[in-house]
């Protein structure tokens, strides 16, 4: 078998899930003359129909992308301890990669709150993704710690509606407004569990190729940047239809 034909057959085999195109009669059952004839036939066909190779490579790329997305979503859905708002048993989950210093995150805050108010079958999980500065890290730690006390929704509203730069003082003010035990909150902020949850979010973002905020994931749709409520509604409707 020529190197050209062998390379093409390997591509086709990988692209179609390991079902080898070459599972013709066993090699031992084919004589040299027949083998040469088959090689020439394959090579002539492939050269005359190069789109076959292209389609095979596209199929392979899609399979690899689908597998990568499945693995990334598995990491994303591991959300124990992540802050959330809404019905804990909702069938639709919106994951938001967010940073409290992100202006675009504040822009998407209002439509998300409106969506939660109008649809009680939606849950918003905040994937705390502090990427802008040290204060972002402190705010993310406080958000996860606020979730542990059951006061995250009010903390989140206070943080998103506050004016001015995020500082430790503004974080503690938001936590106090939400009714948090501040001593416990500060202790939890530095805990290994909170660090693990934030690191888990970083891993999910890397797998999903999310490098900025906000980043939304609804079903299998990854949406970079801020989007309006109408687009969110459309994606949710499509996700519900897909889920049956």
Language-model features, listed with the residues they occupy:
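Beta-strand elements within well-structured catalytic alpha/beta cores of enzymes
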Residues: 38, 93-94
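Structural alpha/beta surface segment adjacent to cysteine/selenocysteine redox centers
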Residues: 95, 100-101, 106-176, 180-181, ...
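A short beta-strand-turn-helix
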Residues: 75-92, 116-117
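Short amphipathic alpha-helical/adjacent loop interface patches that line ligand
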Residues: 50, 109, 202
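Residue-level signal for pocket-adjacent positions within structured domains
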Residues: 71, 79-80, 218
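N-terminal targeting signals for export/organelle localization
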Residues: 2-6, 10-74
């Amino acid at each position: 078998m020529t190197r050209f034909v062998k390379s093409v057959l390997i591509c086709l085999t990988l692209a179609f899930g390991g079902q080898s195109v070459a599972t013709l009669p066993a090699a031992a059952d084919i004589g040299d003359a027949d083998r040469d004839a088959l090689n020439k036939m394959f090579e002539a066909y492939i050269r005359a129909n190069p789109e076959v190779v292209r389609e095979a490579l596209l199929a392979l790329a899609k399979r690899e992308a689908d597998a990568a997305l499945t693995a990334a979503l598995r990491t994303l859905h591991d959300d124990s301890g992540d802050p959330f708002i809404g019905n804990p048993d909702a069938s639709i989950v919106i994951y938001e990669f967010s940073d409290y210093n992100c202006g675009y995150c504040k822009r998407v805050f209002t439509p998300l709150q409106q969506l939660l108010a109008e649809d009680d079958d939606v849950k918003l999980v905040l994937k705390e993704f502090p990427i802008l500065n040290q204060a972002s890290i402190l705010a993310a730690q406080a958000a996860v710690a606020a979730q542990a006390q059951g006061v995250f929704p009010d903390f989140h509203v206070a943080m998103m509606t506050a004016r001015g730069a995020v500082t430790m003082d503004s974080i503690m003010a938001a936590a106090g407004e939400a009714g948090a035990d501040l001593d416990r909150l500060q202790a939890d902020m530095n805990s290994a569990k909170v660090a693990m949850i934030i690191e888990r979010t970083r891993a999910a973002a890397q797998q999903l190729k999310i490098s900025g905020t906000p980043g939304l994931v609804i079903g299998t749709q990854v949406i970079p940047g801020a989007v309006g409520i109408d687009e969110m509604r459309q994606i949710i409707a499509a996700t519900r239809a897909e889920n049956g």
